[in-house]
C-alpha cells in the first residue's frame, strides 16, 4: 500500500493537540513475487528417463553458456551426441551428475539396460542380467533459501546471493537426501480450487472499492451542487 502522511505535527496553529500520522491512501504496488516450492503430487509416466524429486532437491543442468541452472522438472531424454549418448533436458541441455559433469555414455552402451535407484544412482544391467552400479549419480542440489533463486524461464533457476550457494546432495553430509523416482514426474502444487476462491475474493474486494470510489465521487458532486 502507498500512503502520504499529511499530519506530522502534534499541535495545530493554536497550540491545541491533534493526532499525528494521518495518512491518505494513494493505491497499491507490487512488493514482491515469490515462488512456492511445495511438494507436488508425483504422476507415473511411461518415460524411461522421466524423474521426479521427493524432497528439497533440484536437478542440476548445464546451460549453453556453461553456467549451472537448477530445476524440479525431470522430463529428460537420452540424446545422441558426437561420441555416444547424453542425458539431456527437452531443450537439449546436459543433465549433470553429483560431481558437476554431464552424464554421458559411450556409443557401445545399451542405454535400454540402464536403471536407477531412489538416490539417482545409475546402474547398467550386465551379462548376468543383474544391475551393476556405474559410479555415476544424477546430481541434486539444495539451497538454504530456495525463495531467493532467480527465475530465468522454462522452470529453470539460478543461484543468487539471496539463495546461497548450491549444496550438493551426497557431498554435504548435513543434508537430508531427496528421493529421485524414475518414470515419475512432479505435478504442479497449485490447488486450482483454492486459487479460484482467492480470485473471486479479490474480484469482490475490487468491486467494493470501485463502488466506494463511485459513492465518494457522487457525494462530492452533491456537495459542490449545494455550494452553487
Model-predicted regions and their roles:
Residues 1-228:
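Amphipathic alpha-helical polymerization modules
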Amino acid at each position: 500500500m502507498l500512503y502520504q502522511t499529511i499530519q506530522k505535527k502534534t499541535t495545530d496553529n493554536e497550540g491545541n493537540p491533534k493526532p499525528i500520522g494521518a495518512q491518505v491512501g494513494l493505491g497499491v504496488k507490487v512488493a514482491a513475487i515469490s515462488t512456492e516450492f511445495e511438494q507436488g503430487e508425483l504422476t507415473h509416466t511411461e518415460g524411461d528417463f522421466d524423474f521426479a524429486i521427493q524432497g528439497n532437491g533440484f536437478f542440476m543442468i548445464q546451460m549453453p553458456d556453461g553456467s549451472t541452472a537448477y530445476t524440479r522438472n525431470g522430463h529428460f531424454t537420452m540424446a545422441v551426441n558426437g561420441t555416444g549418448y547424453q542425458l539431456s533436458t527437452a531443450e537439449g541441455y546436459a543433465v549433470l551428475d553429483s560431481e558437476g559433469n554431464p552424464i554421458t555414455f559411450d556409443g557401445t552402451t545399451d542405454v535400454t539396460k540402464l536403471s536407477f535407484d531412489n538416490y539417482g544412482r545409475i546402474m547398467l544391467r550386465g551379462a548376468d542380467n543383474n544391475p551393476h552400479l556405474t559410479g555415476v549419480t544424477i546430481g541434486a542440489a539444495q539451497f538454504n533459501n530456495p525463495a531467493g533463486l532467480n527465475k530465468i524461464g522454462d522452470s529453470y533457476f539460478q543461484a543468487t546471493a539471496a539463495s546461497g550457494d548450491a549444496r550438493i546432495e551426497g557431498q554435504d553430509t548435513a543434508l537430508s537426501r531427496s528421493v529421485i523416482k524414475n518414470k515419475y514426474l512432479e505435478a504442479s502444487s497449485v490447488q486450482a480450487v483454492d486459487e479460484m476462491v482467492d480470485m473471486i475474493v479479490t474480484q469482490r474486494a475490487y468491486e467494493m472499492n470501485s463502488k466506494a470510489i463511485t459513492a465518494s465521487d457522487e457525494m462530492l458532486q452533491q456537495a459542490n451542487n449545494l455550494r452553487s
